């Protein structure tokens, strides 16, 4: 009986120790990324060895569903765990803190900080635009570089002819520039630098990459991975947009 009591206390002690050990959390958000990633099997030709390797080491949610096709409502939903139908946020505005019913909502990083003692970091695109990045917002303890689609072709030159006025957001292609000049490079560089500094644990770091958000510009080496004569294009249903509102064409 004494042994059973000792064993029970030992198991309880071990379980409490395990509960006290809080994991560091690195959350990577990729804007407009679909399932064309190797480990998700969305396209037979895609080459994504780095993210495939990362998925094996971490946690990959393979049955997660986007709450909205727009940035602001979708990101708000993710960070406060409420659907657009309950927040009333369906467009690129408003910032949820400006909605009276939501202004005091506790977000994911704030919950971790308050209840888990986490130090919170953020860089890139986590909320839409500048939301959550002002010093007065107090959404994160440490904030790194913001999101950017730059650089763009000189003089805002359009690389392809597109319907409805050659809008820059539906442009795509390559032009002379370096990967190191891209906003996402700066974001990744900052995040790696923070991790190399061995931050105080536990920590929550959210890293939001802008690409593959439109416009779809990349350096030539990425196009060279997919020669035109070998590329398998996705099947497109003829007239697929005929029964959809024009606004949805840009989603």
Where are the model-predicted features located?
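Formylglycine-dependent sulfatase
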Residues: 2-3, 18-251
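Sec-dependent signal peptide recognition
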Residues: 1-9
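Hydrophobic h-region of N-terminal signal peptides that target proteins for export
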Residues: 8-18
């Amino acid at each position: 009986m004494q042994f059973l009591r000792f064993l029970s206390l030992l198991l309880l002690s071990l379980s409490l120790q395990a509960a006290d050990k809080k994991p560091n959390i690195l959350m990577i958000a990729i804007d407009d990324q679909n399932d064309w990633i190797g480990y998700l099997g969305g396209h037979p030709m895609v080459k994504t060895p780095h993210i495939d390797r990362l998925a094996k080491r971490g946690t990959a949610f393979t049955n997660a569903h986007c709450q909205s096709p727009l940035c602001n409502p979708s990101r708000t939903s993710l960070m406060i765990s409420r659907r657009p139908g309950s927040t009333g946020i369906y467009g690129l505005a408003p910032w949820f803190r400006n909605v009276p019913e939501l202004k005091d909502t506790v977000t994911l990083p704030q919950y971790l900080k308050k209840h888990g003692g986490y130090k919170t970091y953020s860089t890139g695109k986590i909320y839409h635009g500048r939301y959550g990045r002002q010093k007065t917002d107090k959404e994160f303890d440490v904030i790194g570089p913001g999101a950017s689609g730059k650089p763009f072709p000189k003089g805002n030159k359009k690389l392809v002819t597109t319907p409805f006025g050659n809008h820059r957001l539906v442009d795509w292609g390559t032009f002379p520039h370096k990967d190191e000049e891209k906003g996402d490079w700066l974001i990744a560089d900052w995040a790696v630098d923070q991790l190399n500094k061995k931050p105080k644990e536990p920590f929550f770091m959210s890293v939001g990459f802008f690409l593959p958000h439109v416009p779809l510009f990349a350096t030539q080496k990425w196009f060279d991975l997919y020669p035109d004569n070998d590329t398998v294009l996705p099947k497109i249903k003829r007239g697929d947009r005929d029964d959809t509102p024009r606004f949805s064409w840009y989603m």
